Amino acid sequence: MKINGIAHIALSVSDIENSKIFYKDLLSFLGLSLVHESKKSCYHVGGRTGVLIQQITKDESCGSFSQNNVGLHHLCFRLISKNNVDELVAKLKKMSANILRGPLNGPWVPGYYYVLFEDPDGIRLEANYVPHKGVFEKNVKFNSAGDY
């Protein structure tokens, strides 16, 4: 058996209306289409990727997002060029998104270029460009010394 990618990811948010605004703007810019919207969720699909945004149930919440808790550390979107990363950074600035770092080159593999930012709940999101085959390139090894 061989995996064919990750079909979708579901993110739980504290304020669905605020998050819908953020994610509709971000995900449509990345080429994902809104295929479902309800009072408590929205679902975007594109490029063999699905992203579901859903309202948390307040009585089941354990607090705010921290990338160091058990669960999701961050979500990274793969882009097709360095220019796409730069275009996204310009879009994020227009959205007043919290950009944590970037765009810059990362140490993980040669040519790794990325931006790290947060959604309204502080969920860490990344967009990167990795040339060629990345870690699958001949004689390239993953450098785990970088800060995630």
Question: Which stretches of residues belong to each language-model region?
Answer:
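N-terminal beta-strand motif that seeds the catalytic metal site of vicinal oxygen chelate
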Residues: 1-20, 75, 131-148
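Short glycine-enriched loop/turn motifs at secondary-structure junctions
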Residues: 3-5, 68-72, 109
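Core segments of cupin and vicinal oxygen chelate
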Residues: 10-55
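Vicinal oxygen chelate
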Residues: 13-18, 75-121
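Long, continuous compositionally biased terminal/linker segments
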Residues: 45-80, 86-90, 94-95
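A short, acidic/glycine-rich surface segment
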Residues: 58-64, 102, 134-136
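Short beta->alpha transition motifs characteristic of CBS
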Residues: 110, 116, 127-134
